[in-house]
Structure formats: C-alpha cells, structure tokens
Amino acid sequence: MRYYPIGLDISGRRCLVIGAGEVGERKAQRLLECGARVSVVGRELTPALSGLAQAGRIVHIPGDYDEGHLEGVFLVIGATDDRDVNKRIYRDARKRGVLANIVDDPDRCDFILPALCRQGDLVITVATGGKSPALAKKLRQELEERYGPEYEVLLKIMGELRAKIIDRGQGPDENRKIFETLVGSDILEHIRKGQWKKVEAVVKDITGVAIDLRPMGIQASGRKGNNDGRKRPVGKKQATSKDTKSMKKVRPARP
C-alpha cells in the first residue's frame, strides 16, 4: 500500500483548487465542508462556484495558473483539463513543500481523496489507491445503503456518554466492555423505529447513566413533522399531500 491513511485537519488553512469546471467545483465544495479557506483559479466559474464566490465563501483568482498562486498554500488540487499545466502544478508544489493532488493522475499525488460515506460525524472512506474511482463509488453507494441515519444518532449518544463514563475512573478495560456491549445491543433497532424511551432505557441498563435525548436534538429530529403522537422511524420519509394525490391517480387494471 503506497498511501498512509490519515485524516487531515484543514480547518482555517489555505487550500487552492486550480481549475474552475465541474471537477474543480466538487473539490472546492468538499474542502469547504472541512472548514478550509478555499481559493479557485480559473478564467470562468461554474454557476455553483460563482454563487460561492459572491457569498464570500471562496476567493476567485481569475486567469491562468501561476506558481505565485502557491504562496502560503497548505495544499493544492490540480483540476484543469491541460495535462502540461497539471504537471507544472505538481512540480511547483513539490518544490515549495505544498501537498498536491492532481486529478486522474495518481503518480502525481501526495495524497488521494477517498470516496466518502457520511452520516453526521461518522465518516467511512473507500480508497483504491487511485486505481479505480468507479469501484470506490460503487462501494460507497453500498455503504450508504448499509449505514443509514440511525448511525448518526447512535454516534451522538456515544459521544455524550463517553466523557461521563470515563470520568467514573473504572479503567479502560471496563469502559471498553461497556461501550462494546452498548453498540452490540438492540439500540440501533430502537433508533430506527423512533422508540426513544426504549433507547434511553437501554443506555441506562447497560451503562448506568441516565440520559435525556431532547437536549441533543435527537427526539426532535426523529419526530419532525409528526404531530399525531405516533413514533416516526429514523430515515423514513412520510408521504406528503403531493405524494398522496399521486397515489390516488394509480388505479388497478381491470381484469
């Protein structure tokens, strides 16, 4: 394996995307999601990038690439459709000690951008060492089907519990046993079904900690738009009036 798997904190760091097309747009948006200070070099921006620039979320550097654009940059992504320009970006970045990723050119990448399956703070990455983005995309889609929004809720609960349990001073072995027992319980099934009282009961029974899910915003998000007192499963979409009208139009065929 060539690449060392690592998570980089780029919040507040200057990151440069060279190329203002659709590929550059995707790269810039992903950098923004991680809190980077993003600049984009290109003659014309896509509509989405133009909107980000007008909102002050990115800096547009009009024109063609110049080595001076790398001054003070933490990492750069080369996303132009000119291979010679991309090669020059990589060469200049190496000379200046700037981390570089050249799109569709794994031999000129100091780092790769894996496919992401994200549920809140839960992030699962898929990387193929740059050999097959298509396979990485397929695996990401399968992961998204397997790990739904209930995992985001569980992670919120685990994060809330972690400090409280560690502060009891029971030792790492006992703490690990408690956490593993909780994630191996039926708590995920209760979350999927919106059975919040059962979720709280399972947590109390296994950990000895009484938690209130409401301050975490969990119950509110799980029951949003449901005013009839019934439990709404996490991740399930309720039929809207528009959906209902569409369903009424579908009639069974006569024999």
Residue ranges and their predicted role:
Residues 1-44, 49-53:
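Hydrophobic, well-ordered beta-alpha structural blocks that scaffold small-molecule cofactor pockets
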Residues 22-23, 84, 130:
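Residue-level detector of alpha-helix initiation sites
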Residues 42, 60-64, 104:
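Short loop/edge segments at beta-strand edges and connector loops
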Residues 53-71:
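Glycine-rich, highly charged phosphate/nucleotide-binding loops
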Residues 75-79, 86-112:
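ADP-ribose/adenylate-binding Rossmann-like module
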Residues 102-152:
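E1/E1-like adenylate-forming module used to activate ubiquitin-like modifiers
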Residues 130-223:
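An accessory alpha-helical subdomain
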Residues 215-254:
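Intrinsically disordered, low-complexity terminal tails and inter-domain linkers enriched
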